[in-house]
């Protein structure tokens, strides 16, 4: 049987398989990028490719369809102990049945290599700091490799191999064997189209065998993109450089509004709630805001922004998850929902899969389905027969920047100059010369401000003070220590009850997440896992010592004092109100131990979910799967609720300008794709942020428009003469709140006249709020159009927005309304009948652009719809469209 059986020709788009219909007519405006936007590593592709692609249908068919995998029949896979069955449904999702855990993961490795190997290979090159080996002499790739090598992700992953359990090692090894069985005797062009394209630019070697450490290194990338508050920590210090006033900086980082938006947990539900004294600290030292320190901080910021986004970070990265107990559901059993908000690309982040032991027993306990990462065995989010779990980003403060004084090869500790740790790394560049870099570290961690040379970054002011040495910025991060997160993933897969989840959570060290779970016997719960540093109060601190500002590396009082014990991390089972919502808001109110962070999402999204659930319960209606699906795609804007009353109070004399304002008068605050009011309001918000803050902040700290900025503006509305309303560039005029609001209304009317139409009735949110999925290597603007069109699905106009439950975020600082992050998948699990559960992912199962499963879920996802999620043996068999047998 051929290992390359061609797939059925896709419906809809002839290239991607995506349906041409979209929720909103998409017309993508020009893009402007900023530090937090998703970066793309782009390569130049020779004109030969364009000629070849249009030369004839035969070339296209042979070249692009060659890598499509076999989905039915029989394949011999070396290393298997017995036969393995792989059933695929209409979306191509594999459900794998095996006799042993090793065969199960061996088959998962084989199947994921069939579907997604180039994605796996790209990820391992990124996480190992070897991207230039894959794509060639590209400045972005070299910068990414330099920073990743500075972190030492691969080195930490190798150390992690020594601490994970023997069982985990066996599973990782089996997975690697399955991947390598697929790679054996296949040329690069038979594995993925991307290798053929890259081969026109650089020499493409046979892909290296997969190594178990490649899987562990992927966990470092996951932890990096979900690392917590490092952007806020840097932004505080950078904002001080222009504001020179800690009180004004504090205005930009208000306290979490617990009185408006409930934290995840009520302290009354905790067994032994403890109080913690927050150290607020007095005024900033003189060095903060100095040109020399600003230069070092900006260098660190640039370096960290060079790492390609693999999961998602910046505006919109977060998640929704909630669980409702059986007392409020139609089935009488808990129902759980989860939709992680991450960067969106093609292929998507998640790989759906089912992993089933033919006979579930202590020797083979896996019977689980859900969402995995291509490149790592097991299921990261999903359910087994007894328990479902979802993850959201906690945002705990697990990173600190330390401002170090460096002189020659030493750095200052107290009154002594101690040696820096130094190592040399060699970057291999396909088609180019090797590059050697020097990585220097303090006891806190690698010096990141030296990763990108100042000459390349065009820095005018060196980070230098000749008397005490030069400033440097080191990064301490929990994920740069080896841990057992890999053990936790398999423990989640096997967990049967709340105690099992608590034990698994103790192993899940990075990234710090919120776990909500539900059991088939009727319990619901929340567990906070993660390795969270303990920081001591520094009484005479010149900036807060709670981790919200960069810390003085020379003062040992700022050193971490260990970690919060896992048994002290917040946890609750069966809370009195009968549901739990975890959507990145504060875990506990301020002042309740343990201290996790002050930089939460501000809770507008979580509060809306609570309101919708409370309304159902108060009305006496039972919650079912459809209810949960409807909540997931709710598109009511909390921004509008806060701002529209003030906007309608402004008097606009010009009738033309007032036409936009009139749209807001009868608006229901919904952000549907066809809503003219939603489009106008977004333009007002963009202008309001620009008019209010751009004159006060450095470009790197300009407002993204996320939930923190809504909290900031909500507070500013109460003070019409706050200095932030004034434009510092108009020296002889002092602007106030109402002038800024009026100007934002007028400017938004003019903007949409240019961007859409003179007639407000022609405006539509979906025309400018566009999701344009890009391939990470071949999808960028420097790639020839025919190639981009082949690998990038059609743009889709989207509903929703930032801090909306249907969280299709956009970055106001970029000037564009394009979607920057969103629900990377949606799932709802009914513990009363697992076969009633639903799921969907943003693109599809396959990573092959020519596959009908490359983007066949996109239109369904964009419409806010889902697919049935079969789990029982009978339901999986009934849904099956293809059956593949893997034999020893």
Predicted regions and their residues:
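Gly/Pro-rich active-site capping loops and adjacent beta-alpha segments
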Residues: 103-136, 390-438, 555-602, 616, ...
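Substrate-recognition/specificity elements adjacent to catalytic centers across diverse enzyme folds
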Residues: 24, 51-52, 59-335, 340, ...
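Terminal end segments
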Residues: 595-657, 743-888
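Hydrophobic alpha-helical segments
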Residues: 448, 510-616, 670-673, 684-693, ...
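Terminal targeting segments of Actinobacterial cell-envelope proteins
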Residues: 1-39
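Glycine- and hydrophobic-rich flexible loops that cap the catalytic core of alpha/beta enzyme folds
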Residues: 355-387, 391-553, 570-571
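Second-shell loop/turn segments in exported
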Residues: 104-108, 146-147, 154-170, 476, ...
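N-terminal Sec-pathway targeting helices
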Residues: 32-53
């Amino acid at each position: 049987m051929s290992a390359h059986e061609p797939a059925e020709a896709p419906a809809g788009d002839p290239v991607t398989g995506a349906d041409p219909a979209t929720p909103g007519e998409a017309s993508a405006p020009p893009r402007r990028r900023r530090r937090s936007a998703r970066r793309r590593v782009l390569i130049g592709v020779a004109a030969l490719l364009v000629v070849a692609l249009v030369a004839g249908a035969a070339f296209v068919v042979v070249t692009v369809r060659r890598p499509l995998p076999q989905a039915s029949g029989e394949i011999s896979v070396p290393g298997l102990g017995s036969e393995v069955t792989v059933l695929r449904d209409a979306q191509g999702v594999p459900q794998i049945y095996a006799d042993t855990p090793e065969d199960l993961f061996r088959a998962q490795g084989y199947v994921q290599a069939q579907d997604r190997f180039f994605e796996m290979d790209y990820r391992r090159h990124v996480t190992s700091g070897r991207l230039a080996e894959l794509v060639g002499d590209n400045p972005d790739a070299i910068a990414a490799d330099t920073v990743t090598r500075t972190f030492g992700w691969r080195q930490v992953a190798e150390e992690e191999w020594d601490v994970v359990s023997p069982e985990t090692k066996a599973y990782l090894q089996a997975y690697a064997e399955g991947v390598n069985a697929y790679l054996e005797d296949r040329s690069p062009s038979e594995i993925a189209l991307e290798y053929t394209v890259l081969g026109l630019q650089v020499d493409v070697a046979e892909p290296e065998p997969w190594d178990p450490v490649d899987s562990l290194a992927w966990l470092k990338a996951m932890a990096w993109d979900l690392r917590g508050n490092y952007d806020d920590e840097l932004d505080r210090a950078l904002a001080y450089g222009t504001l020179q006033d800690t009180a004004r900086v504090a205005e930009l980082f208000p306290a979490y509004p617990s009185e408006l938006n409930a934290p995840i947990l009520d302290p009354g539900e905790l067994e032994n709630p403890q109080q913690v004294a927050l150290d607020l600290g007095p005024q900033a030292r003189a060095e903060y805001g100095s040109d020399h320190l600003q230069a070092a901080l900006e260098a660190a910021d640039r370096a960290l922004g060079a790492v390609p986004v693999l999961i998602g970070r910046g505006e919109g990265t977060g998640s929704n998850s909630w669980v409702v107990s059986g007392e409020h559901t139609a089935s009488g059993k808990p129902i759980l929902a989860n939709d992680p908000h991450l960067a969106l690309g093609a292929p998507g982040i998640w790989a759906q899969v089912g992993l089933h032991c033919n006979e579930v027993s202590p020797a083979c306990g896996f019977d689980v389905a859900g969402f995995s990462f291509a490149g790592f065995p097991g299921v990261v989010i999903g359910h087994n027969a007894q328990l479902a779990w979802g993850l959201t980003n906690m945002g705990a403060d697990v990173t600190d920047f330390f401002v170090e004084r460096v002189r020659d090869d030493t750095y200052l500790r107290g009154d002594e100059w101690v040696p820096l740790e130094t190592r040399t790394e060699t970057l291999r560049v396909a088609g180019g010369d090797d590059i050697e870099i020097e990585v220097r570290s303090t006891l806190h961690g690698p010096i990141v401000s030296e990763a990108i040379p100042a000459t390349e970054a065009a820095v005018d002011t060196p980070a230098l003070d000749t008397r005490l040495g030069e400033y440097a910025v080191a990064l301490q991060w929990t994920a740069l220590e080896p841990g057992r997160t890999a053990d936790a993933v398999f423990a989640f897969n096997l967990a049967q009850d709340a105690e099992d989840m608590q034990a698994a959570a103790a192993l899940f060290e990075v990234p710090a997440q919120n776990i909500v779970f539900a059991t088939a016997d009727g319990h619901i719960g929340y567990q906070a896992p993660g390795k969270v540093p303990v920081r001591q109060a520094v009484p005479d601190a010149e900036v807060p010592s709670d981790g919200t500002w960069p810390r003085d590396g020379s003062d040992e009082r700022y050193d971490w004092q260990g970690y919060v014990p896992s048994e002290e991390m917040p946890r609750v089972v069966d809370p009195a109100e009968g549901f739990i919502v975890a959507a990145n808001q504060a875990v506990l109110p301020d002042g309740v131990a343990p201290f996790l962070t002050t930089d939460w999402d501000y809770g507008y999204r979580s509060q809306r979910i609570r309101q919708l659930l409370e309304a159902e319960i108060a009305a006496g209606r039972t919650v079912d799967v459809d209810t949960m699906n409807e909540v997931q795609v709710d598109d009511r804007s909390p921004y509008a609720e806060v701002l529209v009353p003030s906007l309608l109070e402004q008097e606009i004399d010009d009738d033309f300008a007032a036409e936009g304002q009139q749209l807001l008068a009868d608006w229901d605050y919904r952000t549907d794709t066809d809503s003219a009011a939603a489009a106008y309001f977004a333009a007002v918000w963009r202008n309001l942020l620009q008019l209010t803050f751009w004159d006060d902040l450095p470009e790197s700290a300009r407002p993204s428009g996320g939930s923190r900025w809504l909290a900031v503006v909500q507070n500013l509305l109460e003070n019409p003469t706050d200095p932030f309303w004034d434009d510092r560039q108009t020296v002889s005029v002092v602007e106030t709140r109402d002038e800024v609001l009026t100007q934002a209304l007028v400017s938004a009317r003019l903007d949409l006249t240019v961007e859409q139409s003179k007639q407000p009735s022609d405006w539509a949110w979906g025309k400018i709020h566009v999701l344009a999925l890009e391939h990470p290597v071949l999808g960028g603007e420097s790639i020839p159009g025919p190639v981009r069109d082949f690998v990038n699905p059609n743009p889709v106009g989207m509903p929703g927005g930032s801090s909306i439950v249907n969280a299709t975020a956009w970055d106001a600082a970029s000037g564009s309304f394009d979607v920057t992050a969103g629900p990377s998948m949606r799932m709802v699990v009914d513990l009363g009948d697992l076969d009633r559960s639903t799921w969907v992912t943003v693109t599809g199962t396959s990573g092959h652009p020519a596959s009908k499963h490359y983007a066949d879920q996109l239109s369904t996802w964009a419409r806010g719809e889902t697919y049935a999620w079969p789990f029982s043996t009978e339901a999986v068999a009934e849904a099956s469209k293809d059956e593949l047998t893997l034999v020893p």
